[in-house]
Amino acid sequence: IEEISELIQKGQAKKVVKLVNEALEAGFPATDILNQGLLKGMDAIGVKFKNEEVFVPEVLVAARAMNKGIEILKPYLQDTEHQSKGTVILGTVKGDLHDIGKNLVKIMLEGKGLEVVDLGVDVDAQKFVEEAKIHQAQIICCSALLTTTMPEMKKVVDLVAQEHLNVKVMIGGAPVNQDYCNEIGADYYTDDATRSE
């Protein structure tokens, strides 16, 4: 299982698949393979990314390897106590077409066992709120990389309040900071994908 974690960090998807299958055959519980192998490896990559020891391409390759492993485990996990820890609605706000930061956040959140509904880019406030209702989400996560699109985040916060939704709003992106988060009344601010946990 330790080896699976190391292979995730190297992004070696084929070897991950082989070892996950071997671990299952050897009788290791699927939840252990997931938590101590796949997720542990992704966590380690998250820390390295935060410390600038690895960069976006390495994170994406590791995520691909992790997802291949998760695909094999899925049928086994559905039979066990591995339940989703919650649902997050994720998207880049209206007028903003940047998605690399959002995609990293998605990977990190899924790695924590959260269900992520990715709405993509250029998402208006109404859409965030509608999807949160449909999926009974606990968190709406908005990303913006342009100062001009930041006000869209406030629209999301205001609409959540207006609709009396029991949903937390998390914001992130290059121009955003904790002061802005406080100013618009959002619940959480994250300055990088790895801290989105």
What is the meaning of each model-derived region?
Residues D187-A193:
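Short acidic-hydrophobic, aromatic-tinged amphipathic segments that line or gate anion-handling sites
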Residues V105-K112, V117-A186:
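Cofactor-cradling patches in redox/metallo enzymes
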Residues L77-K94:
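Glycine/charge-rich, flexible interdomain linkers and switch-proximal surface loops
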